[in-house]
């Protein structure tokens, strides 16, 4: 059985070279003291994988080592990435971290239980040569008194998948990323309550000068 750290087969190596060239043309390079590249990616059902270079029709899941190499190559172009739909099984995530290398860090939530939560986590991957954790990590919860207020498109319960806020530091700058995975629902209007709630939450945070930091960026889908 092949492992993610093994040399890939020739066809995959060739494809990875094409991918690198394409990424070079589309994503700006990392520059010391000049930029910080932040991304968000919903990697659908990012959990288990088949430990073959290329999965076949009978294999489950279809995600294979070839896929992980491609995912890791894309992730490596950024400094911090918020990832949604990380599952309870983190085999694919572990292999991705092996490809990225020892200078990459990871912080993630526990699994959201219940049918609506879909057994998902949220995670941040970050290049420790470029950014470090600032010390803040929290899940955002709406105060009970706000839940009891009835209004148009108001949130009447907690988030199905709790938004995850983590602070990062680069040189003398600190910023807080908030990743969320909004309840999709059957209609667009079903998404409004959670979107409005997170907007109000971040607005209140940014206005309070005594809070940990006011540089806030919301990510996700």
Identify what each model region corresponds to.
Residues 1-219:
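Divalent cation-coordinating acidic motifs and surrounding scaffolds
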């Amino acid at each position: 059985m092949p492992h993610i750290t093994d040399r890939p087969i020739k066809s995959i190596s060739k494809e990875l070279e094409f991918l690198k060239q394409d990424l070079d043309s589309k994503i700006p390079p990392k520059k010391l003291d000049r930029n910080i590249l932040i991304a968000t990616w919903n990697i659908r059902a990012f959990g288990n994988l088949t430990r073959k270079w290329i999965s076949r029709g009978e294999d489950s899941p279809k995600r294979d080592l070839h896929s992980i190499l491609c995912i890791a190559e894309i992730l490596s172009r950024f400094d911090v990435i918020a990832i949604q739909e990380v599952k309870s099984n983190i085999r694919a995530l572990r292999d991705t971290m092996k490809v990225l290398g020892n200078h990459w860090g990871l912080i993630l939530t526990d699994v959201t239980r219940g049918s609506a939560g879909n057994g998902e986590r949220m995670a941040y991957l970050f290049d420790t040569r470029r950014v470090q954790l600032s010390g803040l990590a929290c899940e955002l919860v709406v105060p009970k008194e706000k839940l009891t207020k009835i209004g148009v498109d108001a949130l009447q319960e907690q988030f199905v998948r709790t938004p995850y806020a983590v602070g990062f530091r680069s040189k003398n700058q600190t910023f807080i990323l908030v990743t969320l995975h909004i309840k999709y629902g059957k209609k667009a209007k079903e998404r409004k309550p959670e979107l409005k709630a997170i907007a109000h939450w971040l607005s209140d945070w940014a206005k309070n000068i005594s809070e940990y930091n006011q540089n806030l960026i919301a990510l996700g889908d």
